[in-house]
Amino acid sequence: MAKHQIIYTSCMRGIDSVNDGQQIFSYDETFKDRKADEVKSLFTYQVPSLPAGTLMSEEVAKTMPVAFSYRLLKKGSVSVTLNTYLGRDYMGSAGRFGNHLSHSIICDFSDFDIYPCELYASTALRNSMEYEEVNNPDPPAYLQIPELTKGYIINPESIIEFLEISNNLEMYKQMLTAMLRFQIEKKRIIICDEPENIVKWIAALHYTLPLDIAKKVNFTTYEYDPELSPSQICGVISEGSKYNCQNYISLNRHYVFDFINNQFTSVSTDNIMMDFLDTAFSFSYDSLTDFHLFILNSTTYRDCNDKYYSAYYLYN
């Protein structure tokens, strides 16, 4: 499949249409699977419910959560999508509210050579459109073949700094334990925190694993209804969605890490590997990359599950 990209939003005319409205704006010319249902599913975005008496406005629209998502697709491909609520449609100040922008990069699994979170805040994914682009009676041009250009926020150094804050390292180890149980328990990780923190929690979990294993763990930084999500790790907001902290904690169907309401599912981390990760993220990140090489060169461990502990025991 190589690399492809596709943009969906409100426009006067999309590349394949003569009508206006919410539609595919454009894609690269070689993207043959652009009409596949799983590609269309990437465009989905549910705006949060507003508090009673609050009307949508340009200012309120700017506060809506962004959904930065990574997903495994069929035919051995993966996608990274940025869904951004724009507010009004292509008509600008005269338009109606309800418009969002969805920009996806789709790539062969083997060609995706960076950690997905590293695309966060990348110039490769658009979060806005120019008025002249979408309010244009002529069909847009094809998009270029995309590049996997890293953003400026997520990298090992920034995650190490993040885990040094307060008791973040301890919370990370609980999240990791939960992530390694997913294959057996099928319980998602639900993270309620400030938007800039959610993606860092996810990146910390991904960096724990060798790249090709991390790429098997899908996520989203915002999910309106985690119960229906295709993601193993879901970021949520504390109000305005189907997520309810007390209900999720009491039902115990998922591992909840709610930093806004200070409510957490209790997870035991009594394991010698956690001491190793504590040291790796505190003093010696190179030791973690050495462990990754050992896994790939000396073990058969290739999926994110609790056999990760056994791989560490062999390494140790």
Where are these regions (language model features)?
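N-terminal module detector in large eukaryotic regulators
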Residues: 1-316
